[in-house]
Amino acid sequence: MEKMVWSRRQLLKTTAGMAAGSAFSRLAMSQMPPPEPMNDERFTFVTTTEAKPWQTAQVYKPTFTWTLLNLNVDPAKTVEDARPMQGFGGCFNELGWTSLSALSEEDRASVMHELFDPKAGARFNYCRMPIGANDFATEAYSYDETDGDFELKHFSIDHDRKTLIPFIHAAMKHQPELKLWASPWTPPGWMKRNRFYAEAKAYPGMKDNGIRPEQVGHEGEDMFIQEPRYFETYAKYFGRFIDAYRAEGIRVGMVMPQNEFNSAQNFPSCTWTPEGLAKFLHYLGPEMRRREVDVFFGTLERGNPKLLETVMMDREAAAFVKGVGVQWAGKNALPQIHREFPALVIYQSEQECGDGRNDWSYTGYCWQLMKHYFRSGASGYMYWNISTGDGGLSTWGWSQNSLVSVNRDAKTFRYNHDYYLLKHLTHFVDKGAKTLETNGTCDDALAFANPDGSMVLLLRNEQAHEQLVQVAVAGKSAVVKLPADSVATLQIRGQDRGAGVRD
């Protein structure tokens, strides 16, 4: 994460201002008359703090003369060139399924219902999956490790039948309309110049992956063999993957050619140059078009928009690119990408994954990520690990956060803070929703207009004391009370709408 640099004068001025404002806010609130509750079924308000997640809270009448913060939303003012929302979800990783498999069948079904049922909790409807192994696979593998098998006679997804396929089927049981997109972390080893699944040595304290010094890769080089025969075979490899999963009743509707193509990692990875990716798209594009599968550029994990610009300058490659997947430091390129390529759909393709502690402070950081992506035009948002064992340790020794943590010994589970943050979005914001601009003194907010006319406001209070916010949306006004250090959602429905909180 890149840090903002402050001068000492800026820091002192800002700190003093915040302290004075905070003291004034507390004094003013103590002198205000208590707000009067408003019993209007059109309003639903839910709050989450570190200690008390997902609490239905009171909405108040805007009857006093003034409030400390205000938030105004005009449903006609959308974020410029933002596409309607396409979906939310996480990534189907092997360790996600092996952790959930430690639970009883009843508990596992309860988790999947909470995550995927369209009328219940998070309502996930669009998820990611790997093509072969990723860093949360049980081991390194691809669908064809037979050296020189250009006809893909030995292609097989049998490895996935124990993990990914049942994981996805379990989700589809609750969400039959689930959409999927996929990307590889590495091609088969024999298609790479180093003939190995990884490109870096293990970091200190992590599991040795056995890579030799001459096999180490570097950013800015094509590790994939840049020859037509290999491009053609790899494109057909993608096609065989699509076909094999369709035979299992699982339809993948979009692919990206490479996860984090700039990063040489100690786990499955493959570096590409943008020029190399453009060449590959000449082959991948037609294979996917024949199957009615979209192609996005990505995933982009560097804050350099020229990486995308280079591909889009190749007209043949650009003709196949419908969107872009952005993650990690790629977020720094997002505003420029959105300005330069307004026709491209933008997904936040992998939320930054933390360190396995799943603490509340990191959830606050994830809120800032969410705010940045949606204000920059994203129409899809994907978390990374749906579930892990306690500690979130990967096969290659990296601990990461997850929505659900499983204690394998006790056979119990818990929903982590990040889950509730994401639920504040996905429980209320529907497919087809538009991201709206906001204005007022309450800037820590996001706003959406659903296709059914309902409005959804997400608000964050970072202060150590509660705050009152007066909200004005489409002629409707209300006051909400944000608990100290909290995230909240206010849903405003039209006349004769049903209750907003489903579960």
Question: Each PLM stretch: what is its role?
Answer:
Residues 1-19:
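N-terminal secretory signal peptides and thylakoid transit peptides that target proteins
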Residues 348-420:
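Aromatic/acidic polysaccharide-binding cleft in carbohydrate-active enzymes
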